[in-house]
């Protein structure tokens, strides 16, 4: 991505040249570890560090996350950009940033980490998380513990070390990023292994369900439906009884009170 395009993507935001830019791309959901990011940014700001943090995306927790950033007085450091659906725009964000922050333990395999690596951008990840698979700490990415203090400590340690960040990002590009061509080749190779094992009889045959099995399933479903019908009938009787009781109470109220 040309430098002009990378800088144009942040137009309208206060992103000074030379100031470290941290990036998150994805859905704005608390379970992705975004509270860790915001709390870490607060620690950096309180420590006198100058930086910028940009969230690119949207989500059902977006309003709460923005409100929390405001509560932490991070309005001059943290910005929320609109979700990017154009690949060139997403790529420009990756090329514009200095570090990609992804402290999620929810994601099984962070595709955004691969996207960042494709653009030569190193990621900060939770040690032991699924997203950290294939990452070697300090070589093609960085690990932290699952808390804001750990993230802030790492970012302080890396502050101003742009040459190191570029080198780790280049390593990520070489070692983590997998092109579609490579992915297809890997998938085909695995399918060939499966087919060959099948031809050699290495997979035990699976018996098809018997008629008796289906009969038991049918009886079970019939019993469930009968129980459901009984519960619905009972609910109707209870509602009818409650209505009658309410009517009698109202009558007593009118007579004696």
Where are the language model's segments positioned?
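Short alpha-helical donor nucleotide-sugar binding micro-motif in glycosyltransferases
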Residues: 83, 91-97
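A conserved mid-protein helix/loop that constitutes part of the nucleotide-sugar donor-binding site
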Residues: 20-43, 49, 53, 60-66
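Conserved acidic donor-binding segment of nucleotide-sugar-dependent glycosyltransferases
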Residues: 137-138, 142-148, 157-162
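A short, well-ordered alpha-helix in the C-terminal region of glycosyltransferases
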Residues: 164-178
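Aromatic "clamp/platform" in nucleotide-sugar-dependent glycosyltransferases that forms part
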Residues: 105
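Nucleotide-activated donor-binding/catalytic signature segment of Leloir-type glycosyltransferases, i.e.
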Residues: 66-84
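C-terminal amphipathic helix plus adjacent low-complexity
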Residues: 184-257
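Short hydrophobic beta-strand element within catalytic cores of glycosyltransferases
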Residues: 122-126
